[in-house]
Amino acid sequence: MLNPNNSATASEVVEIDKGLKSPSGLTYRNGDLYVAAISKILRYKDIAATLNSSPEPETITDKLPTKSHHGWKFIEFGPDGLLYVPVGAPCNICEPEEVFASIHRMDVNDPDNTLEHVARGVRNTVGFDFDPVTGDLWFTDNGRDAMGDNMPADELNHVTRIGEHFGYPYIHQGDTPDPEFGEGKNASDYTPPTQNLAPHAGAIGMAFYKGNM
């Protein structure tokens, strides 16, 4: 939406692209627009200068899973300059392949599209941000269904080292074994939440306040 006259409402709507599957992730860096669909991430170079000329996207990667259950990809650049990409579990509760239930990061200029695991055991995060002081990654995670109305809690988690495992599908809310996958698992082997949130709250966003209040 464009507002060249600085009026109260946008005066023009420009279609940048179409036919994408669930393009839910958007971020902007150095003049380029990045869009994440279910299985791919696209870059629209110098988007402000090419809006009116049907910009042709560059495919950053098309190697993301095609599963649509928890398949939306919310993306953001970290303070390290890498693009962070969550890949949710393709189910309510299951023991998925390694690429799922994780947060990854990647160099958008890497021709091999290499994904690095940042966090594992993450069922479905759709909200994450970086501490403006330390640069640490924080994220919310939505807990599984079908364990009752009052459990498990949704979670607020803090990544303190690359590759940490936050429990899914074995341990929920830091201390509760899963009835299907938790047998023989110890809660102490996984990183507990920094804060438990209300069960089934669906915490779908978070951001650090950067004002002066």
Task: Give each language-model segment a name.
Residues 1, 32, 40-42, 102-104, ...:
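A short loop-to-beta-strand structural motif that recurs across blades of beta-propeller domains
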Residues 2-19, 45-66, 98-127, 181-199:
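Blade-edge beta-strand/turn elements of extracellular beta-propeller
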